[in-house]
Amino acid sequence: MKLLSYFILLMVAVASCSKKDNYDPPQSKLTGAILYKGDSIYLEYNRVPYQFYQYGFGKLGPVEQTFTQSGVISSLLFNGNYKFIVPNGQGPFLWPKTSGGGPDSLDVTVNGNQQLNIEVTPYYMIRNANISASGGNAVATCKVEKIINDANAKDIEFVGIYINKTEFVSGANNIANAGKSGADITDLNNISLSVAIPSLTQKYVFARIGLKIAGVEDMIFSPLVQVSF
């Protein structure tokens, strides 16, 4: 009799585990981008996180992912109500805070595939970026627009040009870079940069201009371009 009881308990436990393991995975795809007045904000790959917290499931941890280097959001979620946040200290932009100093949240209702574009205020934007090859160098020009001018304003630490053999281009992913410190930039409307292209078997590189803000960990970038030479 005891053996039969143990067997029944074992079957109940196995059935319970199987039920937990057989939930369908999330099916709803939420896509979108982080923007400033409709313009994309370009970031470093796998660098700036965002989080979804779902209502009604106790104290579960967030669903955390990172923006792409084009500032794109792409997440598979269960249908339901979520809070979307960017953690404090992340991103080259201001994210709203609560009165307690934590990151404020955006309410998001997911019901099937949908799009979510999020407007934020960056410290700076790189405008009119142009990058080309000349004399064995990648040369770039751009304009920098200062967006935040109040008590939250921050200085430019440096502006640089970055090139790489692949489409992942940043301070951490490059084969060559060169830049100017903020103190050496005299005209935000006319910034010129140049970096020597190393000897390569391929006849092109990918390039972006990046701007480092003083006191902010994450850089903001120009759109990715392919430069042939």
Spans of model-derived segments:
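Short Pro-Gly-centered beta-turn/loop motif in secreted/extracellular proteins
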Residues: 72-90
